[in-house]
Regions:
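Bacterial N-terminal signal peptides that target proteins for export
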Residues: 2-15
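C-terminal motif of bacterial Sec signal peptides marking the signal peptidase cleavage site
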Residues: 23-26
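Charge-rich amphipathic alpha-helical interaction elements
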Residues: 28-29, 105, 193-222
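Immediate post-signal-peptide N-terminus of mature secreted/exported proteins
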Residues: 29-96
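Secondary-structure edge/capping motif, primarily at the C-terminal ends of alpha-helices
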Residues: 57, 64-67, 71-78, 93-96, ...
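Amphipathic alpha-helical coiled-coil segments
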Residues: 94-106, 143-161, 198-210
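Extended amphipathic alpha-helical interaction segments
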Residues: 106-191
Length: 222
């Protein structure tokens, strides 16, 4: 099952309601303005959204592992109830698909606030009167963008790695649905090793992305 994501961790209940309304109506400038009034800036929002994207990937990782385990149990148990097997695998496929969608949604939220943060940062470089401070801030911006791009690239690798797993899973669930016989189980057995490899690649990419996210969060909090 996909874990319900937490709200941005440091926002009061009242602020959550207000901000949720602003998000729904698409008023990003008003949203940021309201957040800043309670001491929460784009940098803070970015950290929180990266944490949520990281957690969504961790949840998805567990879901895909569970799906593989369920897949394996279906093909190894003798005299498997085919209808029951279909129901179990279909449930795991749906859970995995929702987990993948949640990861993508969280990544989009990260990209949205990051784009706004970096645009604001770059625009405000022109406000400096002290050249040394301006240069230091510009270097910090470039460095932060570079580390962000590396982290985001690892997140997108996760997205790409989920697609072939979901396609393989969906194809086999559909085949089982319309062929509730021994031939269907034989087909699942032939697909298992390939699915396992794809999920192993996915898990590795997720671990890399989670590590990169943690490092990026640590760097921003310094």
């Amino acid at each position: 099952m996909v874990t319900t994501r937490k709200p941005e961790r440091f926002i009061s209940y009242f602020v959550i309601i207000t901000i949720s309304f602003l998000l729904i109506t698409g008023c990003s400038k008003t949203y940021y303005s309201a957040m800043e009034k309670v001491g929460i800036h784009k940098r803070d929002i970015l950290v929180d959204r990266v944490e949520n994207a990281r957690d969504a990937q961790a949840d998805a990782q567990e879901q895909f592992k569970n799906a593989l385990e369920q897949f394996g149990s279906v093909i190894t148990v003798e005299n498997t109830d085919l209808k029951d097997a279909y129901e179990k695998l279909n449930a795991e496929y749906k859970g995995s698909n929702e987990a993948a969608k949640e990861v993508s949604r969280r990544i989009e939220k990260v990209e949205s606030v990051a784009d706004d943060l970096f645009a604001e940062w770059e625009n405000e470089l022109g406000l400096y009167k002290n050249k040394a401070l301006q240069d230091a801030s510009a270097r910090n911006l470039i460095d932060t963008q570079k580390r962000y791009d590396e982290m985001l690239a690892s997140m997108h690798r996760v997205e790409k790695s989920m697609d072939p797993v979901l396609r393989t899973f969906r194809d086999n669930v559909l085949f089982l649905k319309h062929n509730l016989n021994a031939q269907a189980i034989g087909s699942l057995r032939s697909e298992f090793s390939g699915l396992k490899v794809k999920i192993e690649v996915l898990v590795k990419n997720m671990n890399d992305a989670i590590t990169n996210s943690n490092q990026f969060i640590e760097d921003l909090n310094q």
